[in-house]
């Protein structure tokens, strides 16, 4: 049996794919940088070998799966090609692998990871399901009927897939280092829609998704009355959210989610619509929604003394807004303190004003230095340019986070897609 060697095994897609192959009995190993990345924990729990990058890792008989961050000139990839071994890019391999299952791709500018996690949790209670979530979680299940995956629009990677179903949560301008504008983003989603084989579940409250054309049925969900699946009578409190679902204006059932913010109602609606389409029993859906514990780096909470510390991946103005909204729903009596690390110079430059407006929704704002991507050079932009647009915003350094102790009884939200967790860990050490 071939050994699958992953070049960049700690990637947020690569790690779960390695987990899935391992769970299905394949021989798996990989290489990556030696710095700790949270995605390696699940690999280590399965005793999947992780090696430092070295051409000597490449042995005869291997199949090499290459992460997208690594060019063909990477020493391991060059060695594999020189020895005539199969070298397959992550998305191409996954696109072929999906064809064995009823595949459900979850895509959209925001909400992909949470919706993928929620759908996986619910639908696996109905039928055996394998899943790949962009928080580094993967699970291969023997005799799987469904395969649920997070599919990202960045660099049009999701066009490697021809899924049976697609959930489309929203279309928004992001990844300005690749997409020219919102029309370019829409074009990518429109192309994706034409590759879906059975049906599309799309948010009908999104003006761009309403324009999608497809060769399969498009089922719309949302708060507006025109949607096929509509949430009504939404009740938000500190324990979570309850809402009624109407299917084409006929009452279906009442659902409860232990989650906060309107965006989580929409994520749940997408899952309800897909499961209804696949004739999953409503009691299974209700139980799954109630017992979902969330995904990594999405509103992950811990209590420290009088404070609540939240770790969240929010790195776009829209995401910051809904994360602060969720915190206000759960903790209406507390101050909200945003500790934000912008991710990439291009994104920060493109959305400078929007970042400022979204962060102003917090009571206090602390800004970390911009986290640059490996793909870009630092421009002239500095974190001071964002600070100028937010009255009373302060800069914070990883080596001195003690100022945060001043905010007694507050909710501190550490947000970003870079290494914002370093700041959270540093602050926890101050408190220890």
Swiss-Prot record:
Cysteines paired by S-S bonds: none
Highest rank taxon of the organism: Bacteria
Record GO cellular component, one term: cytoplasm
Annotated GO biological process: cell division; cell wall organization; peptidoglycan biosynthetic process; regulation of cell shape
Name of the top EC class for this enzyme: ligase
EC number: 6.3.2.8
Annotated positions binding ATP: 108-114
UniProt KW keywords: ATP-binding, Cell cycle, Cell division, Cell shape, Cell wall biogenesis/degradation, Cytoplasm, Ligase, Nucleotide-binding, Peptidoglycan synthesis
Example GO molecular function: UDP-N-acetylmuramate-L-alanine ligase activity
Main location group: cytoplasm
Nucleotide-binding listed as a keyword: yes
Reactions the enzyme catalyzes: UDP-N-acetyl-alpha-D-muramate + L-alanine + ATP = UDP-N-acetyl-alpha-D-muramoyl-L-alanine + ADP + phosphate + H(+)
Subcellular compartments: Cytoplasm
Known pathway: Cell wall biogenesis; peptidoglycan biosynthesis
UniProt similarity note: Belongs to the MurCDEF family.
Reported function: Cell wall formation.
PANTHER family cross-referenced by the UniProt entry: UDP-N-ACETYLMURAMATE--L-ALANINE LIGASE (PTHR43445:SF3), UDP-N-ACETYLMURAMATE--L-ALANINE LIGASE-RELATED (PTHR43445)
Record-given protein name: UDP-N-acetylmuramate--L-alanine ligase
Gene of this entry: murC
């Amino acid at each position: 049996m071939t050994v699958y060697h992953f070049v960049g095994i700690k990637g947020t897609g690569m790690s779960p794919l390695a987990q899935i192959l391992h769970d299905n009995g394949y021989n798996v190993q990989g290489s990556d940088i030696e710095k700790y990345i949270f995605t390696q924990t699940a690999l280590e729990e399965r005793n999947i070998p992780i090696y430092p990058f070295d051409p000597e890792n490449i042995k005869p008989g291997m199949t090499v799966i290459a992460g997208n961050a690594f060019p063909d000139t990477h020493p391991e990839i060059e060695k594999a090609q020189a020895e005539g071994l199969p070298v397959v890019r992550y998305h191409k391999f996954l696109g072929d692998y999906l064809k064995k299952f009823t595949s459900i791709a979850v895509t959209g500018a925001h909400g992909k990871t949470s919706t993928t996690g929620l759908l996986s949790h619910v639908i696996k209670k109905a039928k055996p399901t394998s899943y790949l979530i962009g928080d580094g979680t993967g699970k291969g299940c023997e005799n799987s009927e469904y395969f649920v995956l997070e599919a990202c629009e960045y660099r049009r990677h999701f066009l490697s897939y021809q899924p049976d179903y697609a959930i489309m949560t929203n279309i928004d301008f992001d990844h300005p280092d690749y997409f020219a504008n919102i029309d370019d983003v829409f074009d990518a989603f429109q192309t994706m829609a034409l590759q879906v084989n059975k049906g599309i579940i799309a948010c009908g409250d999104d003006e761009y998704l309403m324009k999608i054309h497809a060769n399969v049925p498009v089922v719309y969900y949302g708060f507006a009355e025109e949607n096929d699946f509509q949430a009504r009578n939404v009740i938000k409190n500190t324990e979570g959210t309850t809402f009624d679902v109407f299917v084409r204006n006929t009452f279906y059932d009442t659902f409860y989610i232990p989650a906060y913010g309107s965006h989580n109602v929409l994520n749940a609606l997408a899952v309800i619509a897909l499961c209804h389409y696949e004739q999953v029993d409503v009691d299974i859906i209700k139980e799954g929604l109630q017992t979902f514990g969330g995904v990594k780096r999405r509103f992950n909470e811990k209590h420290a003394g009088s404070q609540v510390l939240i770790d969240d991946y929010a790195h776009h103005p829209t995401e910051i807004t809904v994360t602060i909204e969720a915190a206000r729903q759960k903790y209406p009596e507390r101050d909200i303190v945003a500790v934000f690390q912008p991710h990439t110079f291009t994104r920060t430059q493109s959305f400078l004003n929007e970042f400022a407006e979204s962060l102003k929704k917090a009571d206090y704002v602390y800004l970390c230095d911009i986290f640059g991507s490996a793909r870009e050079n630092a421009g002239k932009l500095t974190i001071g340019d964002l600070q100028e647009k937010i009255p009373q915003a302060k800069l914070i350094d990883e080596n001195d986070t003690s100022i945060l102790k001043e905010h007694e009884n507050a909710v501190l939200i550490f947000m970003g897609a870079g290494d914002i967790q370093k700041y959270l860990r540093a602050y926890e050490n101050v408190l220890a």
